Amino acid sequence: MIEIRNCEFVTITGPDTKAFLQGQVTCDIEKLSKNKALAGAICNLKGRVIADFLLVLDGEDVVLRTQSGMAEIIKKTLTKYAIFSKVELSIETRFTKVLGAMADEDEAFLTKITEKLPKGALDCHISTQAILVRIPGSDKRLEVWIHDEKRFDDWGINHNFDTEEGWDKKDIMQGFIHISPQLSEEHTPQALNYDLAGKIDFSKGCYTGQEIIARMHYRGSAKKRLSLLLSKSLIKQDSEVIQRHGEKTSLSKVLTFSNSYNESENSALLSILDIASEEASFSLSSQTDEEQNLDLQSLSYPSLMIGK
């Protein structure tokens, strides 16, 4: 199991919670239930992604899980629109530990929390001990939000967990990118593949940024997309991706990466690139190293609830 530290939580309470969120997020809140979580995003008026999240319905409250540094940004953003709604937003602190688990490898631990594991993408289970959410993708991952880590002794679990680098790489290999404060309001959902990953419901009503996001979707194919590339070399903080196609050369930022120190495995990165033809080539550039070749990989997203 992996300890996930790069996360924060916001709780939204009050009689208008669902109606309020429906006008602020890209997913359809009507599809949120005690057994089904939602993945989505909050956007600004220009259609740029402020934050992404997982939503869980816990009783009458909605719990929003996001990246470190984003909870206060989300609270501040949503509070601006909550003036005329009966809702309260607060930073959630009750989850003392968040774990990443594999459904098969960690089944013995997981069944101590619940007899019935979430099976489908975004299925969830809520108990007095923890919240379990099945992460979309082919690798059968679950997030476990623990209320009280003192129960570890009762469950026969030690406190020595793997670091989250491996978990982050699984996200990268699936083509999932999460918004940090550095990426907030920089990119459209389409450029981040959020439409392909099921984070945008095009059949729901209006929400902040919806008009621009829908126009981009119905206008036709995207010119740029989040892309997965593999490297035999280590990726650095200042690394950039060089894309060459004929006489055209473009430079793109590395949005997130995970290095491998095992010779049998490649390092991996995500970057927003021009839609490539078969003739395009890619390389990694940094201020201190020579260019290194990159291999473009195809991405296949799980089919969730993408409205047409």
Where are these regions (language model features)?
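Basic, glycine/lysine-rich polyanion-binding surfaces/domains
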Residues: 1-308
